[in-house]
C-alpha cells in the first residue's frame, strides 16, 4: 500500500484544482478553506486546513472527502507537479 507523503495545504489545493474542485463561497475568515465539486449525482465538499504540514490522518480524511483512494490521490499529485 502506498505511503502518504507529508504535504502542505498549498499542495493539496493544487490537486483539488487539478481534479476540478472549485473554492466554495466564502464563509468568513478562518483557518480552513472549502472546495466543492458538483457531479451528476453528488456534490462533494472538501475542507482543507491552512498548514505547512498536514498530518497523515487529516490528509487521509481529505482524500476520503474527495472520493479517491490513496493510490488515485498520489497519481493525481504526481500529474499536477
Model regions: which residues?
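N-terminal first-folded block
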Residues: 1-27, 40
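Glycine-rich, flexible loop/turn motifs
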Residues: 3, 44, 73
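Surface-exposed loop/turn and secondary-structure junction residues enriched for glycine/proline
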Residues: 4-10, 49-51, 57, 80
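A short, structured beta-strand/loop element
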Residues: 23-61
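C-terminal structural segments of small proteins and small subunits
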Residues: 53-81
Amino acid at each position: 500500500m502506498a505511503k502518504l507523503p507529508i504535504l502542505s495545504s498549498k499542495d493539496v489545493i493544487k490537486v483539488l484544482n487539478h481534479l476540478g474542485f472549485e473554492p466554495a463561497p466564502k464563509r468568513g475568515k478562518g483557518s480552513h478553506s472549502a472546495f466543492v465539486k458538483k457531479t451528476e449525482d453528488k456534490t462533494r465538499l472538501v475542507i482543507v486546513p491552512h498548514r505547512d504540514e498536514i498530518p497523515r490522518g487529516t490528509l487521509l480524511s481529505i482524500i476520503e472527502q474527495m472520493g479517491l483512494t490513496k493510490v488515485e490521490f498520489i497519481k493525481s499529485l504526481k500529474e499536477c507537479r
